Amino acid sequence: PNNGSQRPHTIILVIGESAARPYMKAFNESMSDDTTPWLTQAKSDANMLLFNNAFACAHATVPSLEHALTEANYYNNKEFNETLSILDIAKKAGYKTYWFSNQSKIGPYDTPITIVAETADIALWSKETQYDDVLLPYLKQINKDDNNFIVFHLYGSHIYYHHRYPQTYQKWTDPGEQGKVADYKNSLLFTDNVLKEIYNYGREKLNMDAMIYLSDHGSTPGIVRNPDTVMRIVFHIPLFVYLSPSYQNEHQLVAQTLKNNTQQYFTNDLLYNLVCGVLDVESNHYDESESLASPKYRFDLTNLKTNMGTESLKDNLKYK
């Protein structure tokens, strides 16, 4: 690739589903329940960067990912069908691209996501929705001597939460409405394990240089998701970026900038530009002013928007 690295390496992006940062121990040290034991421990590694002020641009999967995966966002008014995607930019940078999804390919609801996914060199969907670890064996077909860009699209904590994890992950139980919250925590616990497996395999077998995880949007367990009464928690999402020591050595400015920006505010429709930054590409399809990985990043609480561009993030946060 033209990004300064001559050695074969892999970059992994994991897209979560309905994971809400306020329910994740790694982002909330005062939480008594450790819903993220792997990440809680992994964040003590200086190469693992957690971003505490990441938010979803929308409260539903399609409008969120239609923007996260492409140049189009709620700030530049570009149209989805006129933009490059993260897979396009990775291909231009010399990567073999993979898309592994545990979200159904059929139905009108995922069309823009499927359009992007199908441009991968290899795109695989699980046969039917199963537990997310069904995707892990797909990693075995990847050649560590290639430059690989891999996207995982998890089913994560999609309702109904108790269908998202095997019984062995049922750590919390509660009656009634609180039962949904317990099930939700269990689903996050299982996702944490899936992330651990991807991370370990990438590091041990694929020369992993970077791993990014974020969610499409959050969730409000026990609360009906309605656009008019949507609880603010639905916009609070996790974001982490792992950078290997060799990556940091070769891309010192990007690495230092991301370390400096862990407290910066970010909405996930800016994911495309973050990925461009991590790939360290030079392209007229990369707006550095919209990249959390660039010193030119121009966003903060005063000019970010959520709820499909209709609400200032600053106003939204008043209703925590």
Regions found by a protein language model. Name each.
Residues 67, 172-180, 251-257:
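Short glycine/proline-rich turn/loop motifs
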Residues 88, 105-106, 200-205, 221, ...:
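Membrane-interface soluble catalytic domains
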Residues 15-19, 212-218:
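DG-centered beta-turn motif at the end of beta-strands
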